[in-house]
Amino acid sequence: MTQEMQSLALVPQGSIEAYIRAANSYPMLTAEEEKELAERLHYEGDLEAAKTLILSHLRFVIHVARSYSGYGLPQADLIQEGNIGLMKAVRHFNPEVGVRLVSFAVHWIKAEIHEYVLRNWRIVKVATTKSQRKLFFNLRKNKKRLGWFNQDEVELVAKELGVSESDVREMESRMSAQDMAFDMSADDSDDPHPVAPVLFLEDKSSDFADGIEEDNWDNHAADRLTLAIKTLDERSQDIIRARWLEDDNKSTLQELADKYGVSAERVRQLEKNAMKKLRLAIED
């Protein structure tokens, strides 16, 4: 992969608007042009052909990434993950199958973005089972109005997605509580140590004792997280704090790359490795 392709395709640099303009400046391919390039890559390993295929489809990744903007994650990161999926799709694309690259790539693009959202959305892993994943990514577009579903809507969504009505109600509750769970502060209550609602969103069958146990686990996990961060090297600690622990003005990969004099892809790798270590520390 060339330096130009890696720097543009993997990580939006500068403003999102400038990146979108650059991505849209690459011409779209005709079916004939696409097939010729795909054959050159597939049979000859032509990396210049791969570059052209990727750059001509960046606008499509932007289009897909925009549909995930409601989850509160940085648009640049969503695009970056989608671009990784696009690159994987180009590498696996067989020009003899008889479909356009865009039809083949959409599944790879969405898969990368899905995993990113599931790992990071609002910290809470609201989607842990197969049925919950399906609900997580379809519930928003199935809502016909603001507010809670009525019974007819619950039945319709459950039927469309092939899940139970109780699953629909549970996921709706979790998603509707996303802001409330993390925005509560001590000023919101006379209690100097208010219990955030997130502690009671895990399971509708939970009783109060379960909530207290969950509260204790969260405190334990927070302590383990603090200790785990201290085990990281100084650069990795800075990356995690700048990317995840700052309330405002979270740093982009490119900003951190400029700070440390490395590529944005290298920062992404360091972040990924650090996050893996932190997750393992919390789950132990």
UniProtKB/Swiss-Prot annotation:
Q: Name one Pfam family in it.
A: Sigma70_r1_2
A single Gene Ontology MF term assigned here is:
sigma factor activity
| Classification via CDD domains | Sigma70_r4 (cd06171)
Question: Where is the stretch described as Sigma-70 factor domain-4?
Answer: 228-280
Kindly state which keywords UniProt assigns to this record, in alphabetical order: Cytoplasm, DNA-binding, Sigma factor, Stress response, Transcription, Transcription regulation
Q: What does this protein do?
A: Sigma factors are initiation factors that promote the attachment of RNA polymerase to specific initiation sites and are then released. This sigma factor is involved in regulation of expression of heat shock genes.
HAMAP family assigned: Sigma70_RpoH
Spell out the protein name for this chain: RNA polymerase sigma factor RpoH
From which source organism is this entry?
Answer: Proteus mirabilis
